[in-house]
Amino acid sequence: MDGTYYPAIKLMYHTGMRIGEALGLTWDDVNLQTGEICVVRQRLRRNYFDAPKTETSTRSFYADASLISYLRSLKATQAANEIRYGEAYQLVYEDVENDHAIVILPKKIPMPHGCTPRPLICVKPSGLIYVHDTLKNALRRLGLNSHSFRHTHATRLIEAGAKPVDVAARLGHADATITQNLYAHDTEEMRKETARIFGGLVDK
């Protein structure tokens, strides 16, 4: 896979966000000073914006320093791309008066009436948005799917000692039990740890 989709992969891996949440994240949703990320929308496959999947999916959390450093660099790269492409650079808008449809227009065309700018983080160098299915197909060729990153993020946090309730809040789950049942009940490290604990009891 080339680097085209790296921003989305990086976001999903470091945050556990759903693919629609990552693709719908804008620079306005990220505080590059504090590291706080707010999930307030998702991008649907049919090129519309919508509220996150559930009520608890609307959330905020803090990203790690590595991701924030990468995002700072990415924002600078996008600014340079906008200069390089000039008036041909593509800008993304949300048509709030037309079912929140996504509108993409070259920079030289004024923003349409009823639209709001949506400076997406996950865009191609030209400013064009990713196609959901193309990204999913690229992941599939690597034996992955968009949920792989969500699963990995959660299991690694729980294995490292994070509280399930905190991981659930980070992922946007309504109940920590969901997080435990879906991600953490059968991880390899946890099975090994169980064996070590049992071995310690037997040896006493």
Where are these regions (language model features)?
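Basic, Lys/Arg- and aromatic-enriched nucleic-acid-binding interface segment
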Residues: 1-25, 32-33, 57, 66-69, ...
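Short, contiguous acidic/charged loop-to-helix segments that flank catalytic cores in large enzymes
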Residues: 2, 49-58, 122-130, 142-148, ...
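C-terminal catalytic core of tyrosine-transesterase DNA break-rejoin enzymes
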Residues: 10, 14-21, 134, 138-141, ...
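Short, polar N-cap/turn motifs at the start of nucleic acid-interacting alpha helices
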Residues: 29-36, 143, 162-182
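C-terminal secondary-structure termini that scaffold catalytic or DNA-interacting sites
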Residues: 34, 47-48, 52-67, 73-81, ...
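Catalytic-site neighborhood detector that most strongly recognizes the C-terminal catalytic loop/helix
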Residues: 43, 171-196
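Hydrophobic, well-ordered secondary-structure elements that form the walls
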Residues: 63, 122, 139, 154-157, ...
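Intrinsically disordered, low-complexity acidic Ser/Thr-rich regulatory segments
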Residues: 103-123
